[in-house]
Amino acid sequence: MAAVPKRPSQQQELFWKTKTLEQMSAAEWESLCDGCARCCLEKLECEDTGRIYFTHIGCKMLDAEACGCKDYANRSKKVPDCVRLTPANVRTLSWLPSSCAYRLVAEGRDLYWWHPLVSGDPDTVHEAGVSVRGRVEGLEGEVSDAELEDHIVSWPTLLPKRAKLKKRPA
């Protein structure tokens, strides 16, 4: 009979509270992603101000229903300008949503109730209205670059009211 695996300690379960981004294992780093896919939306930068504008157009590799990459392992080959998040760049990427777990941990803040590491449920990011599910209007390549300005939206920079709650609504 196989030994029953030991339950991780509370400290191990809450690794994002005790470790820096640099100290995290590869598995911990990957699990920090909440699966919202907001970072997978096409963005435009104003040449005059440097301000970043989100659109509701997804990367060509985005599975808009699952809110994940269709080929995560090969994303950089298929989309050369895909930004691979690292402990160094999450501190400098101004376009990361304020709700992004990488950004929160880098700023010394805790995760929201809807984050799968907190809730234990990968669907809470969708229930809270944080993910892009149901909001993507098209994918890269379906809309011309000239038309992208017509698809600028503000919601990716905002946090829905129910997501701001201290705990999961009943």
From Swiss-Prot:
Give the protein family.
Belongs to the UPF0260 family.
User: What is the native source organism of this protein?
Assistant: Rhodopseudomonas palustris (strain BisA53)
Q: InterPro entries, from UniProt?
A: Puta_zinc/iron-chelating_dom, UCP006173
Give one Pfam family. CxxCxxCC
Extract the NCBIfam families matched here.
PRK05170.1-5, PRK05170.2-5
Name it. Answer: UPF0260 protein RPE_1881
